[in-house]
């Protein structure tokens, strides 16, 4: 047996996660996280990655929206048709820092370097730099044929996510370890405890 060779599509593992029986599992054992798992009913690793990133101050308020869209109770809001490709994997919810950067690139023509400057300005709450970036974002969107009000509204929606947003690679690393511990708990419960 090698933990590095397990399937990340094991329904029994997802059943355990969906049951909320996650005491002892990396990142997934708090009462709030157990409740979030039971409501989400994850069925692929991307759900665990998203939940690890969402279960933080700020983004946590978006867990119900993610779940409602995931389960078809609500239609995802992609903010603008140009952003559907970026936001579709997360049901219209901005979760990762990378999404904020991709939105700036797609909507406002930011280069990857400029998008990273925007992300850093949002994360560090530097008002002067943030105001400069907001003007750049809106001006770029205008050049892309997007109305000023729409661009300003989207900027206001992405701003808090960049502040609290989790880097997807970190969320993925945590989610893989969480899934591996869930696998061990599912198939080796005696050894697990």
Question: Could you describe each region identified by the protein language model?
Answer:
Residues 1-193:
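Noncatalytic, beta-rich nucleic-acid-contacting surfaces in large DNA/RNA-processing enzymes
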């Amino acid at each position: 047996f090698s933990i590095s060779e397990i399937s990340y599509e094991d329904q029994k593992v997802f059943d355990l996660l969906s049951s909320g029986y996650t005491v002892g599992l990396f990142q997934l054992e708090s009462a709030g996280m157990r409740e979030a798992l039971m409501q989400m009913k994850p069925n692929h690793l991307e759900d665990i990655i998203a939940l690890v990133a969402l279960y933080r101050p700020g983004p946590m308020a978006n867990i119900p929206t993610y779940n409602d869209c995931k389960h078809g109770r609500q239609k995802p809001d992609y903010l603008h048709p140009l952003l559907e490709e970026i936001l579709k994997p997360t049901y219209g919810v901005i979760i990762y820092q990378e999404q904020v950067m991709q939105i700036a690139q797609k909507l406002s023509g930011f280069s990857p370097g400029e998008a990273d400057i925007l992300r850093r300005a949002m994360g560090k709450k530097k008002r002067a730099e943030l105001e400069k970036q907001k003007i750049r974002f809106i001006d770029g969107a205008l050049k892309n044929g997007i109305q000023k009000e729409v661009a300003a509204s989207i900027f206001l929606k992405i701003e808090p996510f960049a502040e609290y947003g989790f880097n997807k690679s970190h969320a993925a690393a945590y989610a893989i370890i969480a899934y591996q511990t869930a696998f061990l708990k599912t198939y080796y419960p005696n050894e697990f405890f």
